[in-house]
């Protein structure tokens, strides 16, 4: 293939949750930090771990606290602080946007940047990558792995090749030597289920996928087969889209709980916290929505998703929570344990369609929401929140 300008970056914050705590407490640097549920409960699970814990002790996300403590008895176990993770993610995105407006967040700890138009102002893409890593390290206190490539796919693959604190370039000419020997599961977008399907076809490496007859892949997987074949060859035409969230059909958030939650009372606390977070994101985006959905997963990974459409558009936590609570009570037995909770609002429209009610309730609530948003924008997410978040069931503000 023709050589290209590797001007697409994927910046990935290393071991993000654990790194946030190490950034806040320098005494934790170099120590095995494990973000998990309360140590006292046998149902607590590991949500994240520092590289010291991963590489030195074999700690993995999803294992129980009991297992992690057995492998790493002297590890530093810390309860999750999702409000801090959101705050640090926002700070990192601000630094990225100092280099280019073309920033597309992919998750809370990684984003793509297109820096092809920044050469005169900031230098070559490699120079931008080095400066970006330096600023995030100095201003936020977190190391990052950055991949550079001619496409989002190759930038993502490059970022995965050197962790932590890596800087890797992956051009089209590098694909046969660097990508093709890798297991097919390491190709961006391939999960365990697709890996199993490909194994039945005798495909175990990315190179084998790249050399497999595309006609057979299309016959077996439809249009996905063609996309898989292209990705294995490093081909990806999708642009970095800073407005990718502008066309979203829903806004939501989900949390893996630090332990098994049992009973409606505990789960409702999490639903309320998520409703507050989703409502704030909806308002920041300038939307209203009508359809509230919840997702629940038990410790055996059985999943439930249900939704309810409201008679009116909303951006308030109260409306979202009431609908989510109704869905919980209607579709989830109280005795059944919960490990993951998600809440979303769909049917989004511009907030200009808001209608006033006869008694001004909507406008009064809107003024209150705006005041709370302004406080959080200025002082951080923890400046004001529900008191119930400080109970043992709270997850966003350190209650657990």
From Swiss-Prot:
Cofactors, names only: Mg(2+)
Signal sequence annotation: none
Enzyme Commission numbers on file: 2.7.7.7
Keyword Nucleotidyltransferase recorded: yes
GO cellular component assignments: cytosol
Biological process according to GO: DNA-templated DNA replication; error-prone translesion synthesis; SOS response
Site (Substrate discrimination): 17
GO molecular function annotation: damaged DNA binding; DNA-directed DNA polymerase activity; magnesium ion binding
Functional summary from the UniProt entry: Poorly processive, error-prone DNA polymerase involved in untargeted mutagenesis. Copies undamaged DNA at stalled replication forks, which arise in vivo from mismatched or misaligned primer ends. These misaligned primers can be extended by PolIV. Exhibits no 3'-5' exonuclease (proofreading) activity. May be involved in translesional synthesis, in conjunction with the beta clamp from PolIII.
NCBIfam families for this protein: PRK02406.1, PRK03103.1
This protein's name: DNA polymerase IV
Native species: Moorella thermoacetica (strain ATCC 39073 / JCM 9320)
Gene designation: dinB
